């Protein structure tokens, strides 16, 4: 499973708690209420543990977490 699909699956299964939910890679996760502050922390922990990528605190900003595509683009140069 590629990084984008893995992140989307994690969001659907662990944050939305609905593996059958529709989640487009460009959906605004924050405006839609899918990600809140606690969910972002959970997602960062997943990225660090499952993908082995350290996410600096100063990089946890709206532009990097607004969608699955934005997050994958942010993560690309990190590993």
Predicted regions, residues:
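Thiotemplate assembly-line natural product biosynthesis machinery
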Residues: 1-21, 73-78
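Phosphopantetheine carrier-protein modules
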Residues: 15-34, 52-61
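Catalytic nucleophile serine of serine hydrolases
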Residues: 37
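Conserved catalytic core of two-component sensor histidine kinases
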Residues: 41
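C-terminal structural segments of small proteins and small subunits
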Residues: 60-77
